[in-house]
C-alpha cells in the first residue's frame, strides 16, 4: 500500500511540477491540488493506522505488566521462590523490555513525512494565498458582497456549502494589510470580531485583531476610532508594547487636533467620519460602469434597440458546409454588430481541447504599451495556452468551422488560444486591436492588426464571468457551446474604440474560453475596405 500511495503521489507531483506557482489564476490547475490533497490524506490515514496499531501493542503490554507487577510486588520473595518466575523476570528485563523500547522508538512517521516533504515543493505559495485573498476581495467589490455574506458562503449558484472560519477571515484581513490595502483590512477584521463575539472558537485572539484593526483605521484617517480600538487592545493585553506606543502617539495627535484654531476648522471637518470608509479611488476610469455591467445593472438594451436584434440561420456566405447545416445566429448588439452563434463546439470537442490545453496552461500575459514586452498584470487573472492544428485534429476542425462561419481566412489568424479563469478570474477593460499610440504589437507576425475576434464559450458559469462592453452598455453571458463574434476594426482599417471590452470576475464556477483572432492580411477580398474612414 505504501508503494502504491507513493507512486500515485509522485504521479501527481509530476503534474504539479509543470504548473509551478500561481494556482489561483486557473481553476483547471487548482483541481490538481484537490486530488493531491486527497492522496496526502490517504497517506496520513495510513500513518495513523500504523501509530494506532503500535499504541495498541504498547497498551496491551502495559496492562499485562501492570497485572503482573501488582502480583509480584505484593510478595516479592514468595513470587521469586518459583524458579519459572525468576527466569521470566530475568528474561523480561533482558529481552522483552528492550524489544518494547525498540517498538516505542520505531519512526512510523518517516514515510508520511517523506511524502509531505516532497509534495510541499509544489504546494501553493504565499503569492498564491495573497492572490486568492485578493480575488475574494475583487468579487466582494465587483458584486457588492459584504464580508459576512462571503464568510457564510451565501453565493448564488453554489452547489456546496463553504464557510470562512474566524482564522480564515483573519487571514483575509492580514493579506489585505500586508498589501497596504487598509480598506479591506478593516472590513475583514471587523468580520473577525463579529464571529468571535458570536462565540466561534479560533486560535486568533481579539488582541491580534485589534492590533491590525486599530492601525488600519488610523491609516484611513479615523484617529478617534484608532484611539478607542487601541484602548480596547490594552484592556485585553496591558503589556502590549506596540499598542502602548501607538496610544501615546494617537493621544498626541488628538491633542494637536483639538488645539487647531478656528481658521483650520474646515480642515478638521473634512476628516474621515468615524467608522465610515470609502473604497479608494481606482486607476480604471470606467470602473463603476464596468462593475455595474458585471452585476447585470446598467445594460443599455432598450426596447428600441431590442427591436433591431434578430435571430436567423447563418449560411456563412453560402459556404457549402453551411448550406447543409447552417448555424443559429443571434444578434447581441446592433452597432457595432456583435453576434452569437449556437452549437459551435460539441461537448466532446470542448473536453478534448481542454485536455490538450491543460498541460500547456501558463499565466496569461499582456503587452506593455510602452515597452512592447509581455508581462503579467493584476488586471488579467487567468491562464492560457496556444494550440496548433498539429496538436490534434479537433483543433484543425474547429479552425475550419470558424473560417466557414466568419467568411474570413484562418491562414493569417493567430493560433487558437485557450484560457481558463481562476478564483475571481477576470480581464479588465481592454482592446483586442493595437492602437496608434502603442508600439506595433503584432509587427513580428507580419499579418497586420487584429481585424476580428471569435470568442468560444467552453463552459457555463454559475455566476459572474460575463463579457461586457462598457462604452456600449452591453453584457454577454457565457453559454457553453456558443461563440460571439465582432470586428475590432472598421472597414477603413481604423480601430473601433467601441469594442473595448472586459471579462468580468468569475463569482461561482469554472470558466473556459477559446479565442481566435483574425488579422488583416488575407482578408482584403473577404472583407473589402469601405469608402470612408468611418465605414
From Swiss-Prot:
Expressed in the heart, placenta, lung and pancreas. 2-oxoglutarate binds at residue 511. Residues 1-21 form the signal peptide. SUPFAM superfamilies: TPR-like. It holds the Pfam family 2OG-FeII_Oxy_3. The keyword Transmembrane helix does not apply. It catalyses: L-prolyl-[collagen] + 2-oxoglutarate + O2 = trans-4-hydroxy-L-prolyl-[collagen] + succinate + CO2. It is found in: Endoplasmic reticulum lumen. Residues 412-520 form the Fe2OG dioxygenase domain. GO terms for molecular function: electron transfer activity; iron ion binding; L-ascorbic acid binding; procollagen-proline 4-dioxygenase activity. Gene3D superfamilies: 6.10.140.1460, q2cbj1_9rhob like domain, Tetratricopeptide repeat domain. Its EC number is 1.14.11.2. Keywords: Dioxygenase, Disease variant, Endoplasmic reticulum, Glycoprotein, Iron, Metal-binding, Oxidoreductase, Signal, TPR repeat, Vitamin C. GO terms for cellular component: cytosol; endoplasmic reticulum; endoplasmic reticulum lumen; intracellular membrane-bounded organelle; nucleoplasm. Glycans are attached at residues 115, 264. Its cofactor is Fe(2+); L-ascorbate. Binds 1 Fe(2+) ion per subunit. Inhibited by poly(L-proline) only at very high concentrations. The keyword Metal-binding applies. It is linked to Myopia 25, autosomal dominant: A refractive error of the eye, in which parallel rays from a distant object come to focus in front of the retina, vision being better for near objects than for far. Heterotetramer of two alpha-2 chains and two beta chains (P4HB) (the beta chain is the multi-functional PDI), where P4HB plays the role of a structural subunit; this tetramer catalyzes the formation of 4-hydroxyproline in collagen. Catalyzes the post-translational formation of 4-hydroxyproline in -Xaa-Pro-Gly- sequences in collagens and other proteins. Belongs to the P4HA family. This is Prolyl 4-hydroxylase subunit alpha-2. The lineage of its organism: Eukaryota, Metazoa, Chordata, Craniata, Vertebrata. The gene is P4HA2.
Amino acid at each position: 500500500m505504501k508503494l502504491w500511495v507513493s507512486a500515485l503521489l509522485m504521479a501527481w507531483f509530476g503534474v504539479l511540477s509543470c504548473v509551478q506557482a500561481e494556482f489561483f489564476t486557473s481553476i483547471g490547475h487548482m483541481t490538481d491540488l484537490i486530488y493531491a490533497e486527497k492522496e496526502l490524506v490517504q497517506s496520513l490515514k495510513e500513518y495513523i493506522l500504523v501509530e494506532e496499531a503500535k499504541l495498541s501493542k504498547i497498551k496491551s503490554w502495559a496492562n499485562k505488566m501492570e497485572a503482573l507487577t501488582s502480583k509480584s510486588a505484593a510478595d516479592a520473595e514468595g513470587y521469586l521462590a518459583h524458579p519459572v518466575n525468576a527466569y521470566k523476570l530475568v528474561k523480561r528485563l533482558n529481552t522483552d523490555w528492550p524489544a518494547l523500547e525498540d517498538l516505542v522508538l520505531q519512526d512510523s512517521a518517516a514515510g508520511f513525512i517523506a511524502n509531505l516533504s516532497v509534495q510541499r515543493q509544489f504546494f501553493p505559495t504565499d503569492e498564491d494565498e495573497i492572490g486568492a485573498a485578493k480575488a475574494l476581495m475583487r468579487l466582494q467589490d465587483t458584486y457588492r458582497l459584504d464580508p459576512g455574506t462571503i464568510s457564510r458562503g451565501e453565493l448564488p449558484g453554489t452547489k456546496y456549502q463553504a464557510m470562512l472560519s474566524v482564522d480564515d477571515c483573519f487571514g483575509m484581513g492580514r493579506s489585505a494589510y500586508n498589501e497596504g490595502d487598509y480598506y479591506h483590512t478593516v472590513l475583514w477584521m471587523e468580520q473577525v470580531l463579529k464571529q468571535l463575539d458570536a462565540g466561534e472558537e479560533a486560535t486568533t485572539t481579539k488582541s491580534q485583531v485589534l492590533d491590525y484593526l486599530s492601525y488600519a483605521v488610523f491609516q484611513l484617517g479615523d484617529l478617534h476610532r484608532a484611539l478607542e480600538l487601541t484602548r480596547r487592545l490594552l484592556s485585553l493585553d496591558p503589556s502590549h508594547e506596540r499598542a502602548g506606543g501607538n496610544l501615546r502617539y494617537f493621544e498626541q495627535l488628538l491633542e494637536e487636533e483639538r488645539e487647531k484654531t478656528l481658521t483650520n476648522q474646515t480642515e478638521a471637518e473634512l476628516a474621515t467620519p468615524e467608522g465610515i470608509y470609502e473604497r479608494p479611488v481606482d486607476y480604471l476610469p470606467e470602473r463603476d460602469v464596468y462593475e455595474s455591467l458585471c452585476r447585470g445593472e446598467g445594460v443599455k438594451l432598450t426596447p428600441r434597440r431590442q427591436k433591431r436584434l434578430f435571430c436567423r440561420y447563418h449560411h456563412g456566405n453560402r459556404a457549402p458546409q453551411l448550406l447543409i447545416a447552417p448555424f443559429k445566429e443571434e444578434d447581441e448588439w446592433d452597432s457595432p454588430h456583435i453576434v452569437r452563434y449556437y452549437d459551435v463546439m460539441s461537448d466532446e470537442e470542448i473536453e478534448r481541447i481542454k485536455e490538450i490545453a491543460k498541460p500547456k496552461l501558463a499565466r496569461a500575459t499582456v503587452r506593455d504599451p510602452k515597452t512592447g514586452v509581455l508581462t503579467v498584470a493584476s488586471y488579467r487573472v487567468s491562464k492560457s495556452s496556444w494550440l496548433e492544428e498539429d496538436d490534434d485534429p479537433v483543433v484543425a476542425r474547429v479552425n475550419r468551422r470558424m473560417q466557414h462561419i466568419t467568411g474570413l481566412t484562418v491562414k493569417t489568424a493567430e493560433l487558437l488560444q485557450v484560457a481558463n479563469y481562476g478564483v475571481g478570474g477576470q480581464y479588465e477593460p481592454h482592446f483586442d486591436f493595437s492602437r496608434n499610440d502603442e508600439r506595433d504589437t503584432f509587427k513580428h507576425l507580419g499579418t497586420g492588426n487584429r481585424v476580428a475576434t471569435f470568442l468560444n464559450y467552453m463552459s457555463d458559469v454559475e455566476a459572474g464571468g460575463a463579457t461586457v462592453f462598457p462604452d456600449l452598455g452591453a453584457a454577454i453571458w457565457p453559454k457553453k457551446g456558443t461563440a460571439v463574434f465582432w470586428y475590432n476594426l472598421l472597414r477603413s482599417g481604423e480601430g473601433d474604440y467601441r469594442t473595448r471590452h472586459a471579462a468580468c470576475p468569475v463569482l461561482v464556477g469554472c470558466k473556459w474560453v477559446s479565442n481566435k483572432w483574425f488579422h488583416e492580411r488575407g482578408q482584403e477580398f473577404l472583407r473589402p475596405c469601405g469608402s470612408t474612414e468611418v465605414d
